[in-house]
Each structure stands twice: as structure tokens, then as C-alpha cells.
């Protein structure tokens, strides 16, 4: 149970101070470790490079978007924020950017670390029609899907990136 996991983390941390997010993340990882999981899908809380979830070596990462937010933690430019988010990318693994125009920082991080970098409208794409949307993956998979009840084209970008991760 979650309470048992919190007790284990509290004992293991000793005198180390943890934020609530770090504490809860470690408790979740403890619970995951006791399960027979085929995979785990983790969402970074803030940024990437210094996020508590980043202690896990992932096989694949998805960066949904990069915008000017959380500037007090991530920096005030797209480049500085992209650098923080690039911290989730791993050498010799896949990294997916949901948008069509990845910042140069992501491209250079991928190139210098042997990361298979995939991004929207170059490697995978989607089209929205009146009653459905279509997705095309980098390996030729095509899907006709019902429209989502969520508004905004970015929702389709994010869903497309998730489908690309599944296709890989």
C-alpha cells in the first residue's frame, strides 16, 4: 500500500531531506518495484534534468512541447527550457518531440549523444477531419481514429507522439 511505501522511504532516507514530490515519487517507484511490470509510463513533474523521475534510465522519452513557463526553475528562454527538458533524453535510446519544430538544443543533444530523435510532421503525422482523425507512424502504420473530446491541435500532437512511442 501507499502508506507502507511511505514508511519504507521514510526509513531509507535517514537524515536526507526530500520534497513531497521526491518522497511520493520514490514511494511510487518502490511500489512499482514490487510489481511484475512490463513497462512503466512516467511523467516528469517539472522540466526534466533535475526532476525526481529522472533517476530512472528510460528506454524512450517524449517531450510534448516547450514553452515559456516555470521560468524561475527552467530559465527564461526557449533554449534554456529545452536544455532542461533534454535532460530526460538518454544515449542510444529513442526520444520523441511531439511538435513539428524542435528547438536546436534538442537536435544537438540528440546528435551528440547518439539519440534516435523523432519529431512530428517529419517522422510521424496526423490529419484532423470532420468526424475522425488519421495518424501515420514512421514505420508505415496508419490509424483512423475517432475525434477526441479535448480541444486544441496540441492534444493531437501529444496523442500522435504517444502512438509513435507504441509503434516503436
Question: Where are the regions that the model predicts?
Answer:
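Glycine- and other small-residue-rich loops at beta-strand/loop junctions that grip anionic moieties
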Residues: 21, 95-99, 151
